[in-house]
Structures are given as C-alpha cells and as structure tokens.
Design a protein with these regions (language model features):
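Short amphipathic alpha-helix adjacent to the substrate-entry channel of hydrolases
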Residues: 255-273
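Short beta-strand/loop motif that positions the catalytic acidic residue
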Residues: 465, 471-473, 477
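Short alpha-helix in the alpha/beta-hydrolase fold that links the catalytic acid
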Residues: 481-491, 502
Length: 591
C-alpha cells in the first residue's frame, strides 16, 4: 500500500515541482528579481550591524546564553523523568500550533516543542536587548527573524509534528497526495509568491452569495463604478452618505451578507448609501496616480450624488486607504477654495500620519522600495496576489502557515467562509499609485508635511479640513496601528471624535450591533498622547456603529424626505449592483 503511495506521491511531487519552476520562472523572475536582490542587500547590512553590536556587548549575550542553557537543561531533566511533563515554557496565548495533546503528553514532542519555543524566545530577546541598533533596523531584524523562526516551526513538518505523523500513517499517505494536488493548484494560481488558499474559492459568487444588497450602478469611468443602493425605509435622511473603500481591496467587505452588511444596516437606519467600487487595474492603468483617486474618483462621485439627490452636501466615510483618499479630497476642495461639498467625514482605520506604520514598516526602506518601484514600472501594477501574501505574513502563524499545514500536509479542503473569500479576492494596485503610497506616504510621510502632496495642481493641507470628523480605529489592528491613526486625527482641523473599537482591522470594523460582540472606548477630549487618551477613555458595550449613527444624524436635517430617484438624466442606470468592476478577478485579463 505504501509502495503505491510513494509512487503516486513522487509523480505528483514531480508535477508540482515542474509547475512551480514553469510558473514562477525561479531562476530569472524570482531569485534574480530586483526585490529579491534588494531584500538580500538589506538583510546583509542588517545582519552585519547585528553582529557588530553583539560583538561589542558580549556580557549581555553571555547572560542570555547562560539563561538559555540553564532552561534547556531543565527541559532535558523534566522529559527524562518518567511521568514528569512540567513545562518550562508554553506557547503564547492564541498560538494554536501546539494545541494537540501529544505536544504536552509525549516526552519527545514536549521536548521538541519546548526547545523550539525557548530558542525562539532567546534569539528574539537577544536582538531586543542589544543597544546601538536604530529602532527601524531592530524592528526589521526582529520581523524577518520571526519569519524564519516560524517557518521552521516543528509544527510545519511531518517528522516533528505528532498529529501529522499519526494522520499520515492512518491514511497511508493519502493526505499528502491530496495536499500535493492543492499545492499544485495554488502554484498555478499564485504570482511570484506562493499564495496559500484560505477558503473554497468556488463556494461564493459576487452578487449572488456576497455583495447582495440591492442597488444600481449609476456611473462608470476608467477608475470606478458608483453604486446607488435602494432604500429599505419609507423615508430617508436628507443627506446622502458616500462610502469610499480602499482601492487595495474590494468594497464588499462592507456588504458580505445580510447578517453582517454595514451597507444594509445603514439603509435600515434611513441613510441613502452610495458606494465606490474601484476597478481592478491592469497594465493599461499603470498611469493611474493616487491623486486620480481624488479628482477622477471621489470628486466625480460627489458630483454625481449631488445631481441625483439634488443635495448640495453629502456625508462621506472612508475605509483604510480609502479614508486617506477621502481626507485628501476634503483638503483638495479646501485648496481649490470650492464650496463645502462634504458635510462630515468618517475615517475607518485610516492612516494620515504614516510615522507609525506597524509591522508593514519592515518593508519601508529606500532600497526595498526602489526595487518594488522597478518591478511595478516594468509590470504596470503591483500584483494583488503578492500583496495579499505580504499582508498574510504580518500574522504568519495564523494567516499563512496554519493553512499551509492544513491544506498541504493534512490534505484538508478549505472551508467555505465569506470573510476569507473576500480576503482571497485580491485586487491589483496601479504602478503609479503603489509607488506613491510606499515612497511619498509610508517612507517620507509627506501627507502631513507643508507642501508635501500636490493633487490636481494644488498643494493640499490636512489642517485646512474644517468639517466635523469621526475617526474609528481598532485596538488590535496590525495594519493601521491605532496610535498612528490617532496621530493622523490630530493633523486635521474642525471638531473631531475618536473612537477605539475592540478587535482588529476587519472584525473590529465589520461589527454588526445584532451580534453584540465587540465594544469600544470613547473619550471626547483628544489628548496629545494616544495612550493618555485611552487611559481617560470610557469603555462602552455594544458596537460602535450605533454611536456613529447617532453622530451622523447630527449632520442631517431633522425631517426625513422621500427616497431619492435612482440615477438621473446625466447619470442613468448602467447595471445592477454589484456592477462589473468588482467581479474582475486576478490575474486581470488585458483588453
């Protein structure tokens, strides 16, 4: 039986290996890519700095080594004593890699686990303890060291994972055959980095299973489609609401299903909701700049909404980079001395000040960014599949390696999960826009500088934003650190409200009140320090959505009106929601 397995396994392994080399063109496209060379250069320089400081601080190194050796001996002694399974070190809370009871109860695997965890902790603590390394270099070394350490976790290998070994023996290796088949398919559908499947990509259809709230596309240009949602109440608030999603993701994270759709909930509260659905760019859109998302994006959407509804002002909300675009739009209006067209602005997990980028900062380096720019310019865009893997590796154990083990080594089929489907439905970013984000915003933090960013021929200034603003961030957000978003809020003028939700970048925002799952913190006084603000904040139960809705109602006339007509003479209905742009999947077919 095993002879037959090994024969099949070797055939599939050869097929997968051939596909890998063919699709990735490893020799020339990956190994010799500008980005790979830049990463090697940066890692070499960082390692040299690390060794230099380690050589200059032998006492600190020896102290940690002595502690490691003492604890390692204790692990030896504990596992050598029959029945004594006392744990010297445990996995951190939330780390599910070693949840199988064999890691705790079987001496050999307990030893492997504890030795690995102890080495990992000692190595990272050693880097952290070294003086003389600048903060950015230290953060980068720790980040990439952590990537290597977690990639080499004993949980990722059959021989050192008791659960995998037992499963493979019980199934006569069929799990590995099934896993290789999935690996081959993922290699075929990946870009230059292996994108591990998180969910069944055939389980959902955009417009049928997700993004199902009824509406109509009333405008389309090269950049976006504008969706006008159909009302769910007899009367509606007089001021329409425009939502600006990030152009690095698809909008329907805010309209997954009826039970968790923010769009549907807002309609139920009487808001007239309009949504921008960004195009998934290909090489033909390489020229699209960040400023175009303002002048050809939000500005065009606002004009369309004004004509359709007959209202002179709207409320607007932006999510993540969509919020950055929205803030830039409001500042653009101010710089052009135009009439106030946006009555209030809401920012979900939005960075305006990029001085605290979080773990994304590991990639924010002139050498690395220059290499990415070279690749973007040659290709015309940043491939969304690679971008998706980059974000997954910010939480590598829970968003990458666990799926690697589950899919390829256990041979399990990915589950059907709407949120993970959206997360896997990646979108490209045009070369010009991605280059701008990395260099002008993340690296040089120009958005908060005087005459730092010019859009549509004018310098924009966030301090000129005088409309009421509502900032909501989440405490566990690892993509847009809430301390960083808080700093951005301080750069704007006007009345400001800052709210801190529980959970992370997605779950903390998509937090339907009916679930009563996550609460939030509120403090009406914006202190200079984010931590000081939090120390004086009051925790509230329930979703921040209800608080935001109460805030939005302030910027609506007291009396509601009849629902607005769908489209207008100049903005006729083109298509039913969700439109066509959101259905573009990667790789984008060039027309």
């Amino acid at each position: 039986m095993f002879q037959h397995f090994f024969s099949d396994y070797l055939v599939k392994l050869q097929e997968t290996n051939h596909q890998w080399w063919h699709d990735f063109e490893v020799n020339k496209a990956v190994v010799n890519s500008p980005l790979n060379k830049a990463m090697q250069e940066v890692n070499f320089e960082d390692t040299a700095k690390l060794f230099e400081q380690a050589a200059n601080q032998p006492a600190a190194i020896l102290k940690l080594q002595a502690q490691w050796w003492e604890q390692q001996l204790q692990i030896w002694q504990n596992v050598a004593l029959a029945g004594n399974q006392a744990q010297i070190i445990e996995a951190e809370k939330g780390d599910k890699r070693f949840s199988n009871e064999a890691w705790q109860n079987e001496a050999m695997y307990s030893f492997i686990k504890q030795s690995y965890l102890l080495f990992s902790k000692t190595y990272l603590d050693t880097i952290e303890s070294l003086e003389g390394l600048d903060e950015k270099t230290k953060e980068r070394i720790i980040f990439f060291s952590r990537q290597a350490i977690n990639a080499l976790s004993p949980s990722n290998f059959i021989a050192t994972n008791p659960e995998l070994l037992k499963l493979t023996l019980e199934q006569n290796g069929q799990n590995l055959l099934a896993g290789l088949e999935q690996l081959k398919e993922d290699v075929e559908s990946s870009a230059d980095i292996l994108k591990v499947r998180m969910t069944n990509n055939n389980a959902f259809r955009v417009g049928d299973d997700v993004a199902t709230t009824a509406g109509d596309v009333v405008f389309q240009n090269e950049l976006f489609e504008l969706i006008q949602y159909r009302p769910l109440t007899e009367k509606v608030n007089a001021t329409p609401l425009l939502i600006v999603p990030p152009f690095i993701n698809k909008y329907y994270i805010l309209d997954l299903t009826a039970k968790n759709s923010m769009v549907r909930w807002l309609l139920e509260q009487g808001h007239s909701v309009f949504m921008i659905s960004w195009r998934n760019p290909g090489k033909a859109q390489a020229h699209v700049e960040f400023g175009d998302y303002v002048t050809e994006g939000v500005v065009k959407a606002v004009s369309a909404i004004e004509e359709i509804t007959g209202q002179e002002q709207i409320n607007a909300a932006g999510y993540c980079i969509g919020g950055t675009v929205l803030a830039s739009t409001v500042a653009y209006y101010a710089a052009k001395r135009m009439k106030k067209r946006i009555k209030s602005a809401t920012f979900f997990t939005t960075l305006l000040d990029f001085s605290q980028p979080g773990e994304v900062g590991a990639y924010i380096n002139d050498t690395i960014i220059s290499a990415i720019e070279t690749q973007n310019n040659a290709k015309g865009y940043m491939d969304g599949r690679s971008l998706s893997v980059t974000f997954s590796l910010l939480r590598e154990n829970s968003l990458y390696w666990n799926y690697y083990v589950d899919n390829y080594l256990k041979g399990n089929s990915p589950v059907d999960f709407d949120l993970l489907y959206w997360n896997s439905d990646s979108t490209n970013v045009s070369a010009a826009s991605h280059n701008f984000l990395l260099r002008e915003l993340y690296l040089e933090n120009k958005l908060v500088q005087d005459k730092g960013v010019k859009i549509g021929g004018v310098w924009i200034d966030l301090n000129k934003i005088k409309i009421p603003s509502y900032f909501v961030s989440t405490k566990e957000d690892h993509i847009a650190l809430w301390q960083g978003t808080y700093r951005g809020a301080l750069h704007t003028g006007g009345n400001k409200t800052f709210v801190l939700g529980e959970s992370g970048h997605i779950a903390g925002i998509v937090n339907h009140p009916a679930k009563n799952k996550y609460g939030y913190w509120l403090n009406d006084t914006l202190d200079d320090s984010a931590d000081e603000w939090l120390s004086n904040a009051e925790h509230k139960e329930g979703s921040w959505w209800t608080h935001w809705n109460e805030w939005l109602v302030q910027y609506n006339p007291q009396e509601q009106v009849e629902p607005f007509p769908v489209g207008s003479e100049n903005y006729p209905v083109i298509d039913e929601a969700p439109g066509q742009y959101v259905k573009q999947v990667l790789p984008v077919k060039e027309s």
